[in-house]
Each structure stands twice: as structure tokens, then as C-alpha cells.
Curated annotation (Swiss-Prot):
Main location: nucleus
Entry GO MF terms: DNA-binding transcription factor activity, RNA polymerase II-specific; RNA polymerase II cis-regulatory region sequence-specific DNA binding; zinc ion binding
UniProt tissue specificity: In embryos, expressed in the presumptive heart mesoderm. In adults, expressed at high levels in heart, small intestine, and stomach and at lower levels in lung, pancreas and colon.
UniProt region (Disordered), positions on chain: 57-111, 274-355
Source organism of the structure: Xenopus laevis
Taxonomic lineage from the root: Eukaryota, Metazoa, Chordata, Craniata, Vertebrata
Record field: compositional bias (Low complexity): 66-83, 292-319
Zinc finger regions, GATA-type: 182-206, 236-260
The keyword Flavoprotein is annotated on this UniProt entry: no
Protein's name in the database: GATA-binding factor 6-A
InterPro entries referenced in this protein's UniProt entry, alphabetically: GATA_N, TF_GATA_4/5/6, Transcription_factor_GATA, Znf_GATA, Znf_NHR/GATA
UniProt keyword annotations, A-Z: Activator, DNA-binding, Metal-binding, Nucleus, Repeat, Transcription, Transcription regulation, Zinc, Zinc-finger
Extent of the signal sequence: none
Amino acid sequence: MYQTLTITSAQGPLSYDPSPGTFMHSAASSPVYVPTSRVGSMLTSISYLQGTGASQGAHSVNSHWSQATSESSSFNNSSPHTSSRYHYPPSPPMHNGSTRDTGYSSSLTVSSRDQYTPLARSLNGSYGSHYTPYMAPQLTSAWPAGPFDNTMLHSLQSRGAPISVRGAPGDVLDELPESRECVNCGSVQTPLWRRDGTGHFLCNACGLYSKMNGLSRPLIKPQKRVPSSRRIGLACANCHTSTTTLWRRNTEGEPVCNACGLYMKLHGVPRPLAMKKEGIQTRKRKPKTLNKSKSSSSNGNSSHQISMTPTSTTSSTNSDDCIKNGSPSQNTTPVVASSLMSTQQTESTSPNSNTLKYTGQDGLYSAVSLSSASEVAASVRQDSWCALALA
């Protein structure tokens, strides 16, 4: 993926211009080389630095460079041949720096095993191996190879725009719900994910609590109150039982069960241990609805048992009731008796006469009947204690 300075065995043509015009001085005095205007010409091939006396050959130049199959074919010192691009023989190599030239050539010469390394590639941008590369779509060349190919151009060519493999971190979290975590309680599993005001994830419980109360949900659950009948370590000071419906305290402040506390309250002495029972005895209370129905039925029966026949006992009781309720004097009793007798006689003599009854007082005044309106007015005037009858 990244270019190195490793050069494959397929070497390019000679990278210098051996014409006499390129030297600053004459060739006999000092052979100082002046580089040409090409950028990567010095990096493509420095094969003339070999320490041998024979001149180095150059490969033929095509539109692209082909990789050599063996090292011996590309570096053949015994058979010099000229380049097809330049029509003049190459300059002889320098003999005065053989030791230094050998060090340079050893670092830049590629062995036969280096041509199959994954980082080595030819100048045309393709790999030497005949296997199909799996990263080929990302390393495709941006422009086709030309006759001016070199290492510098290919190093710039391979640096294209990186291919985005995955999106932003927020999108990845949305696609992977198991990676979410509640910022309040730390839960990773919830039937519904919610968000707080800042956009952080909350579980369903914390989100609802925050929405309803406006506060963060408390992390510590409140301890449930232990029932009084099952409090750990609590026992009756008298019978030593630990099960009761109600805990009480004796005069000394010690906890006692309901039975011992009631016994001490009623009798003033501690409850004897012989009365202790394993189970809790409760009373069988009758429902209150049955008691109400019975009382209403008894009241109805008593009201229907009142006799409607006019007798002296009823008249006397009625007169007694009137006297107790606030009669002005005791002289009204014979007046009431005489009026009742006169009404009974008129009923027996004239049965077809008009009768007047007071509604709502049939039980008390069922025998009172007057024949005319004048008698009604006279009776009302005489009986001052019956002023409520006009209401």
C-alpha cells in the first residue's frame, strides 16, 4: 500500500545524458555530471555505479516496464548493449570510488526473492505475483502508465482519497443497539431506549422517571419495611413468641405479643405460659350488612303490629303522649275523651256522613272522624294541644 525505495529487478534505461554537452568542463579534466530536467531520472536506475570494469547495459524502453523473471537476465555485465532510445554509447563507470560505489549498489540492488514481497511493485503500478490481490479496488491507478513512468510519479499516484469503510461513531451506535448504555443506572438492556435533554441514552425506567419528576432516577432502591409480625430478632418478653398480629409494650417498655399485652391490660397480671398457643386465634366477625338488614326488618314488623281499632286504651295512650309532649294543663284529658265518644256516636248513627282523616297520622288518630266542617273548627279551638294538626 505504501511505496518504498525498493526497486524491482526490471531496471529502466540509463538515467543520465552521456553527451559531452552535459558536462560543465571537458571530459578529460573533471567529469562533473549535470542532471537533466526529468524529476525521477536519478531514482529509476543507478546501475552505472557498479564497481566492475565492464560497462552496464540498458534494457529496451517500451510504453511500460515489464518485470524480469530472473536477476541474471537483468544484470548481465558480460554482454553490453546499447539503448534504443539513445544512439550513443554510455560513458564508462567511475573507477576511483569502487568501495563507496559498492555500498550504494548493495543497498539499491534488489535480489530475486525481494521481487515477491508485498511491498515491492513494478513501475507500472501492478504486482509481480500472479495471485489476485484482494485490495485491488483501493489501489487502482489514477491514470494510465506512460513512457515517462518513474518511482516518484507512482508514489504520488497511489495516494488517492481514502475509501470510507464505516460511518460516524453515532451511526455505528444506532446500528448496534447492544452497545448502548444508560448514563444514569448503567443498564444495557431495556425494552425502549430514551434520551435526556443532552442527547444521552437512558433506559425506559430512568427516562420515564426523569420525564415525570424532572429529576434523575435514584440508583439506590429504598429498603422495604419488614412487617411487624416478621421482624427479625423480635420476640415477646412474656411467652417468647415471634409471630403476632400486633406488637405491644408492657409497663417496662419491653415488646410483648398482642395476647400477652391484652391479658396484662385486662387482668393486671402477666399472661400464664400455659395459655400460649401455636396458632393465632382470631374472632369471626359477622359482616355489618347482615346486622343492618336485621335491625330494619325488626323495625318494620313492630310498626305493622299496631292495632287500628278504636279502643279506650289507644285513646288513653294517645292522650298520655300528648300530655308528655307538652300539654298546657291537665284539664284537657276529659275534653279529649268526650270528643272521642261523640265522634263514635256520630259514626254509628250516620255511616254515610263525610269523614276527614289526617294523612301521615293514621296510626295515632285513625278513629277520629268529624261529620261537618263546623265540628272540625270547634274541636280545633277547644284542643289547644293539637295545634300541630293544622301544619
